[in-house]
Amino acid sequence: MSIKTLISVLRVTLLTACLLPSLFFVRSAIAGPYIWEVVMYSSSGSSTPAEACEKARVVADRSPDWNYTSATPKMNGLDNSYCSVVYVSRRDPSVVNTCDDCASWKLFRKGDQCANADDTYNASTGICEPPPKECKEGELFPAKGPDSPVVTSGGRNYVGDGGAPTACYQSCEYGGNPSPASCYLVKGSTTTGFCNYILKGTGQSCGADSYTFSQTGDSLNPPDTPNTDPSDPNDPGCPPGWSWSGTTCVKTPTDPTDPTDPTTPGGDGGGDGNGGGNNNGGGNDGGTGNGDGSGGGDGNGAGDGSGDGDGSGTGGDGNGTCDPAKENCSTGPEGPGGELKEPTPGTWDDAIATWEKKVEEAKKELKTKVKANVDQMKGAFDLNLAEGGGQLPCESMTIWGKSYSLCISDYAGQLSSLRVALLLMAALIAALILLKD
């Protein structure tokens, strides 16, 4: 081999040796989503540092000598981030070790962008964060209050928690001052309890999430205890839009098969003729209802259905003929037609006029009967004080040798007043008798 050939081979070898690392570097820097890995654990690749540390911990925990109890990310930029690990000796559990910067637990990142183009990379956490959620005011959120002492009063148990908590869920703030939705004893305790509350969204965003979903515990009071908060072990009082999972309230998942707009689902609107024939003219324009057409058509398909399938259920109109000798050509009883109209308002005028007439007749009848009774009683009680030549009688008599005179004229004024009083009493008595009947 000539010296020139040897030099050429050496040049190629050196060039390859120089290019290989750069090829690996380019591969790690090619376009793709961010992936975090732990140096000594290639299977730990994840979208977040925390997930990568946990995957590596699971693998490391297979060690016969050490029990790796935790591995959490300790972020300090791309070149100086580690998984902080805690591991315990399996032979002697009292031996506990920690390491915040072990070389074998160093984190590194691959890729050059977030998997979701709308996300924003947070350099301090190494996580791609989604855009802020629109926080809706009044949105309901089931939250567990703090564990608090149980107070007994009047034979009933109460939780002295001081009121509803606040919560930050998916960067939205929830609060308010609601009454407890349910209260329980902490499981296994008789002196400590908690209450669940239905908080409402304030419409404001918040920082780090801080919340605990509603949950259940042991019953705070017997079920039949009056004037106490609910304590059903199978229902903490999840609000609409949330469901009981058996341990806590969770968001009720939406059905992806349901259309967002129920007025525009896909489907074939078919029309079925009632004239014995089968109209097959289905309109594939997004109709929702199946309409029954009223057109006739023989059973052999002579009638060509023209169902429009527009979603209103009008169905197809059969254009065929029907033989009454062979088929029932009736289209069925005809339903009510027309449309609803505003009713004509009624009036009480006729009824009022009728009763006014009856009242007037009753007044006249009462007046006639009162007059008749007054005249009758007037004849019984009338004193004709003018009888005797325009002068009241004056009688003289002798008793035991003495003369006495009784002159009615001396009492003319009193008798006249008595006459008027008797007439008035007679009229009142007659009126009472008539009204009683």
Curated annotation (Swiss-Prot):
Main location: virion
GO CC entries: host cell membrane; membrane; virion component
Signal peptide: 1-31
Chain intervals for the UniProt region annotation (Disordered): 214-347
Recorded topology in the membrane: Single-pass type I membrane protein
Keyword Protein transport: no
UniProt name for this protein: Attachment protein G3P
Organism, scientific name: Pseudomonas phage Pf1 (Bacteriophage Pf1)
Gene: III
